[in-house]
Amino acid sequence: MISNNAPAKMVLNSVLTGYTLAYIQHSIYSDYDVIGRSFWLKEGSNVTRRDFTGIDTFSVTINNLKPTTTYEVQGAFYDSIIDSELLNAQIGINLSDKQTFKMKSAPRITGARCESEPVDVGVGAPIVYIDTTGEADYCTIELKDNSNANNPWVKYYVGALMPTIMFGGVPIGSYKVRISGQISLPDGVTIDSSGYYEYPNVFEVRYNFVPPAAPINIVFKAARIADGKERYDLRVQWDWNRGAGANVREFVLSYIDSAEFVRTGWTKAQKINVGAAQSATIISFPWKVEHKFKVSSIAWGPDAQDVTDSAVQTFILNESTPLDNSFVNETGIEVNYAYIKGKIKDGSTWKQTFLIDAATGAINIGLLDAEGKAPISFDPVKKIVNVDGSVITKTINAANFVMTNLTGQDNPAIYTQGKTWGDTKSGIWMGMDNVTAKPKLDIGNATQYIRYDGNILRISSEVVIGTPNGDIDIQTGIQGKQTVFIYIIGTSLPAKPTSPAYPPSGWSKTPPNRTSNTQNIYCSTGTLDPVTNQLVSGTSWSDVVQWSGTEGVDGRPGATGQRGPGMYSLAIANLTAWNDSQANSFFTSNFGSGPVKYDVLTEYKSGAPGTAFTRQWNGSAWTSPAMVLHGDMIVNGTVTASKIVANNAFLSQIGVNIIYDRAAALSSNPEGSYKMKIDLQNGYIHIR
C-alpha cells in the first residue's frame, strides 16, 4: 500500500494537429512535487503512453502519429512517488477527461494542366493550374523538367493550399510536379511537413494559342463595266466568326490561274490584303480563265499558327455567269485640286472613308462616326498621329505601355532608353525573359536599386513591412503564429471571451496583481496571428482556468524543538569512578539544560586519559553501554539491535520492521510524530 496525495486533475484545453505531430495545451499544475506528465493515446483498440518529464511548459508536442487518423487522448500529472508500473496501471494519478482529435490530411495533386492568359492580341503567357486536395497552412509546389532525369526540382509556388492553384513563370516543356504541405504549430518554431507527393503524370507547358477561325461562305459577284473599253470586275466576299480562336488581324485573298496552280501551287498566286474588310474587288478579271481562290485569316501569334486558310474555291467567268453591278456603285472616289476622298454609300447617304488634304497633307482614315471623328488622323503641323483605338506594333516609344507578347517569341519590356537589366545606368527596366520564362525588374542605379531576376528580389535600401500593428523593419521580421496567454482577476470563474482580439476587453497580456486574498487570477490561451493581432481564423480562446493558487490561512508558530543527542567528553582531575553530578553539570553549563535521550558522555582523568568511563543517557539515568567503540567499526556479520540511531550509517543489508525519519526515531512517540514511515513487516510506505 502506498499512500500519497495525487496531483490535481489535468484539463486538456485544446489539441492542434499536423500530419504526424499533435500540439496539446493543458492546464497548469498546483502540486509542487509534480515532476512530469503522461498522455495516453488510443487508436482503435491500441493504447500507447507518452511521458514528458519537463514541467516548464503547459503544452506538449506528440510525434510519430498517422495522417488522417482519429485518436482519443487523456493526460495526467505525476509526482516522484509514481513509477512506470503505476502509470501503466493508472494508479495514484488523476486522469483528464477524454478528448478526440483527427490528424490532418496531407496535400495531394489530382490534376495538372497548362492554360494561357486570355489576351485580345497575340499570345498569352502560359499559366500552370494544379488541382489539389488535403489540408495545410501553406504548401510548396516544385516542378522538374522531364527532358533529363538529372534535372533538379525547382520551387515555383509557396503559399496557401487552394482547390486550384495557379502560377506562371514556367518555361515551355514537359514537367513532373510534386507538392508538400506545412502546418505551423503554436509554439512558433515547429513546422510539421507532410513530405512530398509526386503526381504520376507528366504534363506539358506550352503556348495554348488557338489559331483564328477560317473564312467561310465565299461568294463571287461579277459586273460588266462599260467605261470607254468594256471590262469585267469581280467582287469576292466572305463571312468570318471568331468563335474560340484568336482575333483576326487582317484578311488576304489569294488567287491564281488553275493551270498554273497545277504546276506551282500557290507560289505564284496574286494576293490582295484588305485589312479587316471582308471583301475584295479584282478589276478587269479575265474572261473564260478558270482560277483558284482562298481567303486567309491572319492573327498575331506564333508563325506556324497565326494563319488559317479557307477552303479552296474555283471560279470561271463565262457566258453562264450572272452579272450583278450593284457593288460598283457602293463606293466612290473624288479626286480634285483640293483633296482625294473615298466614300461609301449607305442607303441614300454617302459617307467618308478617307481623305487626303492637298494643301496640308493632313490625312483622315476610316469611316467617320456620328460626330465626324475618324479612327485615325494625322496632323502634319503638330506632327501627331491620333488613333482612336489600339496600335499593334513591335516597337513603340510612348509614355504609357500595354506590353503584349505578339508572337510568343518576343521579350516585351518597358525600359529607360539605354538601360538594360542589371547595368549601372539610372532608370527602369521591366519585362519578361522568354528564355527562362521569368519576369525581371530593375529600378535605380549601381548602388541604389530594387532588382528582381525572376527568383530573388534584392533591395539596396532599408525595407519596412506595413502591418495592422504598425511598420516592422526587415531585420525584426514578422513573428509567426504563436500561443498567447490572457489573464483576468476576479473572485469567481469568468466566462470564456468571445472576441478574437488580443487581448479581449477586460483581459490583459500579463498577470495582474492581487489586492485581496479573496481575488484569484484566471487564464485562457489561444493561437495568435501576429499580422492581424487577432486569433487565427476559425479558432477561439480556450476554456478559462484558475492560474493563481488558493490562498491558505497563516499557520501557528511551532514549539521550540528538543536539542538532538550527541557524543561528548569531559576531563576531570583525580577521576577514579563515573560521576553523575559532574556529567549533569557539564550539560547544564554548556547547553543550559540537562542531557537528552541518547546523549553520550565520556569522563576521563586529566593527565591520564586511559582512565575513562562512558555512559549514555536513557532519558532518566546514565547507563553503561554494553560496548563502547572509540573509532570506526566494520562488521561482516550481523548486528542485532532493537533500535539504531545514527547520523550516518552504511549498511549493505538491514533487517528491521519499521524505519522512521531520524527526528521521529529520536522522539518519545515516533508513531505520532513521523514525517515518513516505511513498514517493512506489513509492506507499505506512508508520507505525511
Curated annotation (Swiss-Prot):
Subunit structure: Homotrimer. Interacts with baseplate hub protein pb3. Interacts with receptor-binding protein pb5.
GO CC terms in record: virus tail
Cellular compartment(s): Virion
UniProt name for this protein: Straight fiber protein pb4
Main location group: virion
Protein's UniProt keywords contain NAD: no
Role: Together with BHP-pb3, forms the central straight fiber, bearing the receptor binding protein RBP-pb5 at its C-terminus. Upon RBP-pb5 binding to the host receptor FhuA, the central fiber reorganizes and undergoes structural rearrangements that lead to its bending, bringing BHP-pb3 close to the host membrane for anchoring.
Source organism (scientific name): Escherichia phage T5
Pfam families the UniProt entry points to: Fn3-I_PB4, Fn3-II_PB4, Fn3-III_PB4, PB4_spike
Name of the gene encoding the protein in the UniProt record: D17
Key words of the record: Late protein, Viral tail protein, Virion
